[in-house]
C-alpha cells in the first residue's frame, strides 16, 4: 500500500492549477446513462473514483475514450447491474440508480461503500423514486428498482438535505412523464453543475442553486460537450496549506464564488486574500495565524469537506478554536492521528476544541478518509521532522496528482510505493 513521506517545516509558495471537481464529475459521468448519443467532457480530473466510474459505465455496456478529455457513448448499454466489486469502493455509485431506472426501467445497484465517515442513508433516494412510480426492493445487498413504462412526475419533499439524493432524483426526473418538484433540495455548486450539464443536453430543470427544483420531463436527451467546474475543495485545501505554512500561493483555473464561506474564515484566520474571475491568491507571509470558529452545514454554509483541513489550521494557530461538525456523525477520525503528532485537541461529541500547539512533531499516521488524509499531509508540512502518512489510497480518490502539485509549491513530499 502506497504511503507519503513528508519532511516538515516547509513553506508552500507559488502557483497551482486547480483540477475539475470530483464531486461534479462523478454525477455528470453517471448522467451520461440518460442519453444514447455521444458526450464529450473536458476538465475531468484523473482520479481513482473517476476511473472506477468509467469502469462501471463500461461494465454496463458504454463505450468510453479517455485522452485528456472523456468521451462517453451509452447507446449500447445492455446491463442494469452495478456490482458490489466496483460499488464497494465508492459511495457515489448510488448515482447509477436514478439514470438506469429512468432510461431502462430497471436498476440493480449494490449498496455503496467509500469513506467510512457516517451513515449516509439511501432511504432518501429510494423514497423519492417510489414516489415517481418505481417499485423498489432491497435484497441480497442490492437496491433493485423496476419501472413499468416511464417514471411519473411527483412532488418530493426531502426529509433532510442530501446532495446525492438531490442529484439522483433530479437525473431520474429528466426523463419522467410530467413535472417533478423537489423541495429541500441541496444547493451545492456540484448540483448546479449537474443541472447545467443536463440542461445542455435538452433537460428542463429550473431552480438549481435554490432549495426547490422544478423538472419537466422530456422524451430523450441529446449528445453534447461540457466542461466540469473547478474543484472548490481542492482549491480550499491548497489555500489552507499556504495559511498553515506561512506561505503565499495563487490558485489558477478556479472559481472564487464557489467557496465564499471558506475565504471568509481564512481572512478571519489572518490571511490576506485577493481574487479575480478565475484565480485566488492567499498571502500569509509574516502574518500571525489566528484560530477560527467553524460549523459545517449544507451549502452555502461552511463545507464539511473542509472541516479536517481547518481542524489542522486551528491546531497550529495561536489560541483556541472550535470546530463543530453537523453533517456526518463520525468525521473526526483524523483527530487521534493529529494528537499523535502533538496536537492539543479535545473532542466533545460533535465538537473539536483545538488549543494552541507549540509545535507539531512528525509521526507515522494513518489516513482514514479522503479529506482526513489531506489534513494529515498539511500537518506534516508544519511538523518538525518527518511524517509518514499510510493508506493514501484515500487521497488518490479525490486529489489529482497531489504530490507533484505540492512539490511544485515547495512541499517536501514523496510517494513510497507499497
Curated annotation (Swiss-Prot):
Query: What subcellular compartments does it reside in?
Result: Cytoplasm
In-chain residues carrying the UniProt-annotated modification 2-(S-cysteinyl)pyruvic acid O-phosphothioketal: 115
Where along this sequence does the record place binding of UDP-N-acetyl-alpha-D-glucosamine? 91, 305, 327
Q: Does the keyword Cell cycle apply?
A: yes
GO MF terms listed in the record are: UDP-N-acetylglucosamine 1-carboxyvinyltransferase activity
- Residues recorded as binding phosphoenolpyruvate, renumbered to this chain, are 22-23
* E.C. designation(s): 2.5.1.7
Q: Which reaction does it catalyse?
A: phosphoenolpyruvate + UDP-N-acetyl-alpha-D-glucosamine = UDP-N-acetyl-3-O-(1-carboxyvinyl)-alpha-D-glucosamine + phosphate
Residue numbers annotated as active site: 115 (proton donor)
Pathway the protein takes part in: Cell wall biogenesis; peptidoglycan biosynthesis
Chief place of localization: cytoplasm
Query: Biological process GO terms, please?
Result: cell division; cell wall organization; peptidoglycan biosynthetic process; regulation of cell shape; UDP-N-acetylgalactosamine biosynthetic process
Q: What protein family is recorded? A: Belongs to the EPSP synthase family. MurA subfamily.
Q: NCBIfam families, per this entry?
A: murA, PRK09369.1
Task: Tell me what this protein is called.
Answer: UDP-N-acetylglucosamine 1-carboxyvinyltransferase
Q: Which organism is it from?
A: Aeromonas hydrophila subsp. hydrophila (strain ATCC 7966 / DSM 30187 / BCRC 13018 / CCUG 14551 / JCM 1027 / KCTC 2358 / NCIMB 9240 / NCTC 8049)
Amino acid at each position: 500500500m502506497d504511503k507519503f513521506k513528508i519532511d516538515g517545516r516547509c513553506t508552500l509558495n507559488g502557483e497551482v492549477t486547480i483540477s475539475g471537481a470530483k464531486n461534479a464529475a462523478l454525477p455528470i459521468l453517471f448522467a451520461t446513462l440518460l442519453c444514447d448519443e455521444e458526450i464529450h467532457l473536458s476538465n475531468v480530473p484523473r482520479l481513482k473514483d473517476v476511473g472506477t466510474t468509467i469502469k462501471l459505465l463500461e461494465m454496463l455496456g458504454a463505450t468510453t475514450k479517455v485522452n485528456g478529455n472523456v468521451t462517453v457513448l451509452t447507446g449500447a448499454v445492455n446491463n442494469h447491474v452495478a456490482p458490489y466489486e466496483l460499488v464497494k469502493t465508492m459511495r457515489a455509485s448510488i448515482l447509477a440508480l436514478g439514470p438506469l431506472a429512468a432510461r431502462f426501467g430497471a436498476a440493480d445497484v449494490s449498496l455503496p461503500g467509500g469513506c467510512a465517515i457516517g451513515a449516509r442513508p439511501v432511504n432518501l433516494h429510494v423514497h423519492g423514486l417510489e414516489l415517481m412510480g418505481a417499485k423498489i426492493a432491497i435484497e441480497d445487498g442490492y437496491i433493485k428498482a423496476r419501472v413499468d413504462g416511464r417514471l411519473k412526475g411527483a412532488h418530493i419533499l426531502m426529509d433532510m438535505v442530501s446532495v446525492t439524493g438531490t442529484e439522483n432524483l433530479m437525473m431520474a426526473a429528466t426523463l419522467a412523464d410530467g413535472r417533478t418538484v423537489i423541495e429541500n433540495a441541496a444547493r451545492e455548486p456540484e448540483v448546479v453543475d449537474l443541472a447545467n450539464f443536463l440542461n445542455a443536453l435538452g433537460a428542463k430543470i429550473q431552480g438549481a442553486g435554490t432549495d426547490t427544483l422544478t423538472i419537466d420531463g422530456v422524451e430523450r436527451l441529446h449528445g453534447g460537450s461540457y466542461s466540469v467546474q473547478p474543484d472548490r475543495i481542492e482549491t480550499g485545501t491548497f489555500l489552507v496549506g499556504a495559511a498553515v505554512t506561512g506561505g503565499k500561493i495563487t490558485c489558477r483555473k478556479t472559481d472564487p464564488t464557489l467557496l465564499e464561506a471558506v475565504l471568509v474564515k481564512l481572512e478571519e484566520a489572518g490571511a490576506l486574500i485577493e481574487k479575480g474571475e478565475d484565480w485566488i491568491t492567499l498571502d500569509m507571509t509574516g502574518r500571525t495565524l489566528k484560530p477560527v470558529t467553524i460549523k459545517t452545514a449544507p451549502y452555502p454554509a461552511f463545507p464539511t469537506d473542509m472541516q479536517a483541513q481547518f481542524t489542522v489550521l486551528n491546531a497550529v494557530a495561536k489560541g483556541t478554536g472550535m470546530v463543530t461538525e453537523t453533517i456526518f456523525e463520525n468525521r473526526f477520525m483524523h483527530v487521534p492521528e493529529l494528537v499523535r503528532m502533538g496536537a492539543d485537541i479535545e473532542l466533545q461529541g460533535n465538537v473539536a476544541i483545538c488549543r494552541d500547539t507549540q509545535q507539531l512533531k512528525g509521526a507515522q499516521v494513518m489516513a482514514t478518509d479522503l479529506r482526513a488524509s489531506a489534513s494529515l499531509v498539511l500537518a506534516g508540512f508544519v511538523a518538525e521532522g518527518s511524517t509518514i502518512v499510510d493508506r493514501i489510497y484515500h487521497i488518490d480518490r479525490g486529489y489529482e496528482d497531489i504530490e507533484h502539485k505540492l512539490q511544485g509549491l515547495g512541499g517536501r513530499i514523496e510517494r513510497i510505493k507499497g
